[in-house]
Each structure stands twice: as structure tokens, then as C-alpha cells.
Design a protein with these regions (language model features):
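Glycan-recognition surfaces in beta-rich domains, encompassing non-catalytic CBMs
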Residues: 1-296
Length: 298
């Protein structure tokens, strides 16, 4: 995956073109897939994108008779062989990323491929048109400011349970805490924001959380309801907060833990937002603004 300083654009599997395959859809917050969908491909994947690279994440093939490689063609260049990671063993992982490409419009065709696709990540370039896109911000991004002493970073794979392929969270890490008073803040220029994490269905107790968006508070509680039949010990892509539609412009989201009991945790994986700027040159540098304000206050 690209570096944390890059701007990543999320491309979910329904936004891709396949020559042959099928798509599974699950109810919200019940499975492991971004957007609650994934696609199993037996043929070609064709993508046109504007940026400097693209990567694909999903399950590699379970079948021992399926090819352990595929052909990757980029623009007018000759296709080349790519081997799946962990060939012979089914894993949920980033199974392909293009080399870094010149900023611009690119065509990628992955052929003779049998694989599962959950999502793709495009690294935006200066010429990438961002209107209508979804920016994804990893939990390790410097744009997220963590407060409190209880935060811990984890890079362990998520255990999804029988019938599912375990795998890493987006960006391979999460931030977790159960300390009252811990929180984070994030500033963005956009028209909608969502917060996603990992939920532990085998944990006990509760974590109560306040999300404050531009001064308006939304309270929620993370807990496992009584008599719940646990299907997944943990799940990825659990929606922790959604703003709904906002006026396009600059916004501030603050999260704060107000109560915690038992061993339940707040686990942050990533944020997504719809930008209100059209190109990277128009993206505000809130990190620099916060740093300048801090120096002025000293």
C-alpha cells in the first residue's frame, strides 16, 4: 500500500468492471467486507483510474486447481506475470499493487484471474479529479490527533470465525482504547464523514462514546446485546459513526470515551469522507494549521 502521507481514494467492488463473476451482499455490520459486498472473479478485471497507483484487496483463491498467478497489463505496456501472495493458501490480503506510475489517466487489466475482490485503493495525484470520490484516512495518519494515555496500536489479524478468511484491517493496523477520557480529533473539508473500526462480539461490558461534529454531539454505546448468537468473534468495517450529508466546507470531528466497563474496546481502523475540493491543490493542510497554532500558543 502507498505511504501514509498519500491521499487514498476508496473504490468498492461494485464500482469495478468484471468480465465474469458474482457478487455477495450482506446486511450492514454483519460481515467482513467494505460496503458489505465482495465479488468473486473468474476472468478479467478492467479499471480506468486517474492517479499514480492502484492496489486490490480481497481473498485469494481457495481452490487448489485455480491458477496461482495472473497477467497484469498497464496502459499500452505488455502484460506481465504476477503471483498471488501465499500461493496455495487462501488469505485475505492486498494481492496486487501497480508500480508507481506517472500522474495521469491509466488503464489496468488483470486477466486470467480467479480471485475475490473486496475493494481497491487509488493513490491520488495532482491531476486526479476528486469530486464524487471517497477519501479514506488510515488510523495511523498524521491527520488524526489522538488524546489520552490508553491508546494502543495493533497489527494483529482479525479473527472472523468459521467459514471466513481471517485477515488484516485496512492499512494493516488499528488504534484501540477503553480509557475514559481518551479520544481523537479530525478536521476535513467535505460533505460527509464516516468512522469505521473493529467490533469484538465476544467482549463483555460496554464503551460509551460521544462524537462531536462542529459542536453537535451524537452519543452511542458499544456493547453486545443479550442473547446474541455470535457468528464472528470480531468483524472488520464496523460503522462507528456516520454524519449524513453536510454542507460542503471545513468541519471538525471529535470523539471522546465517556464510560467503559468490562473488556469491550473502541477500535478505530479508518475514516472516510467525501471531499469538497476538486483537486489536491485545494486540500486544506489542517495538520500544518494545528502545528502553527501550537507554536503561537507557546
Amino acid at each position: 500500500m502507498s505511504t501514509l502521507s498519500d491521499v487514498w481514494l476508496l473504490l468498492d467492488d461494485p464500482q469495478m468492471t468484471f468480465s465474469a463473476g458474482s457478487r455477495k451482499v450482506l446486511p450492514a455490520n454483519t460481515g467482513a467486507w467494505i460496503g458489505n459486498t465482495s465479488s468473486t472473479i473468474g476472468g478479467d478485471i478492467s479499471i480506468v483510474f486517474q492517479g499514480t497507483s492502484i492496489s486490490f484487496t480481497g481473498d485469494t483463491s481457495l481452490s487448489t486447481t485455480s491458477p496461482t498467478w495472473f497477467l497484469a497489463g498497464i496502459d499500452l505496456n505488455s502484460p506481465y506475470n504476477v503471483s498471488f501472495p501465499g500461493a496455495g493458501t487462501q488469505i485475505y490480503t492486498q494481492w496486487y499493487q501497480t508500480p508507481m506510475l506517472p500522474d495521469g489517466l491509466h488503464f489496468v487489466n488483470l486477466s486470467s484471474i480467479f480471485v475475490n475482490v473486496d475493494y481497491a485503493i487509488i493513490t491520488a495525484g495532482a491531476t486526479t479529479q476528486l469530486n464524487g470520490s471517497t477519501i479514506v484516512v488510515d488510523d495511523r495518519s498524521s491527520e488524526i490527533t489522538y488524546t489520552g494515555t490508553g491508546w494502543a496500536t495493533s497489527d494483529t489479524e482479525i479473527i472472523l470465525g468459521s467459514g471466513w478468511v481471517n485477515g488484516p484491517p485496512l492499512g494493516n493496523t488499528t488504534h484501540r482504547t477503553s480509557n475514559v477520557g481518551d479520544g481523537f480529533s479530525f478536521r476535513f473539508a467535505g460533505s460527509k464523514i464516516d468512522v469505521y473500526g473493529v467490533f469484538e462480539w465476544t467482549a463483555t461490558g460496554n464503551v460509551d462514546v460521544d462524537f462531536v461534529l462542529d459542536g453537535e454531539t451524537t452519543s452511542s454505546s458499544l456493547f453486545v446485546p443479550l442473547n446474541t448468537v455470535v457468528v464472528h468473534p470480531e468483524i472488520l468495517n464496523y460503522q462507528l459513526f456516520s454524519s449524513g450529508n453536510l454542507l460542503a466546507g471545513n468541519h471538525t470531528l471529535i470523539m471522546n470515551i465517556t464510560q467503559a466497563n468490562g473488556n469491550q474496546s473502541f477500535i478505530l481502523d479508518y475514516l472516510t469522507y467525501q471531499p469538497s475540493f476538486f483537486f489536491l491543490v485545494g486540500k486544506p493542510n489542517f495538520t500544518a494549521s494545528a502545528s502553527s497554532a501550537s507554536h503561537l500558543a507557546c
